[in-house]
């Protein structure tokens, strides 16, 4: 990666982080839930998935700013998967990105709810993108497929149900 590419990566990463900061800021009775969502969503990370979306949008002639809602949606979906993956009933991790996991900070119930809420919020973010309705629908469908039984949930199932057993390439792919 050249210095120009790195500078561009950092600039896009900063835009994505700034956009993510605007979500879940309301003062409401569910403040602890929002805190759990923001804690995990804003805990750092490379933002590779949203960065790729922004770059693909630009390469295909789209506008970087118009891609940010969908980019945030992808990061929300990714964060939901990490929260759930860390739960005691899954991988039972205590740390994520060098910090206590969501369930360690906010309890298991709030972590499950934070993950569920981030998954739903991901679709809201994608569907709020200022693009043609067909394109927005296609993005939401792609996101849903990525999360469903053939995507992340299916992968998590294989991870938990086959733990300690040999897994062949065909069943994973």
Spans of features found by a protein language model:
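Mg2+-dependent prenyl diphosphate-binding active-site environment of isoprenoid biosynthetic enzymes
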Residues: 14, 21-24, 28-173
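N-terminal amphipathic/basic leader segments beginning at the initiator methionine
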Residues: 2-24
């Amino acid at each position: 990666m050249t210095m120009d590419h790195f500078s561009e990566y950092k600039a896009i990463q900063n835009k994505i982080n700034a956009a993510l900061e605007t979500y879940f800021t309301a003062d409401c009775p569910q403040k602890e839930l929002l805190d759990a969502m923001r804690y995990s969503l804003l805990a750092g990370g490379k933002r590779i998935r949203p960065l790729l979306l922004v770059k693909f949008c630009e390469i295909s002639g789209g506008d970087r700013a118009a891609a940010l809602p969908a980019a945030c949606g992808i990061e929300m979906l990714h964060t939901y998967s990490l929260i759930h993956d860390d739960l005691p009933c899954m991988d039972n991790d205590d740390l994520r990105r060098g910090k206590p996991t969501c369930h360690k900070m906010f309890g298991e119930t709030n972590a499950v709810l934070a993950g569920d809420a981030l998954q739903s919020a991901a679709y809201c973010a994608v569907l709020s993108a200022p693009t043609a309705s067909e394109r927005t629908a296609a993005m939401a469908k792609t996101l849903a497929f990525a999360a469903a039984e053939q995507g992340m949930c299916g992968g998590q199932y294989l991870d938990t149900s086959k733990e300690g057993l040999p897994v062949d390439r065909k069943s994973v792919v």
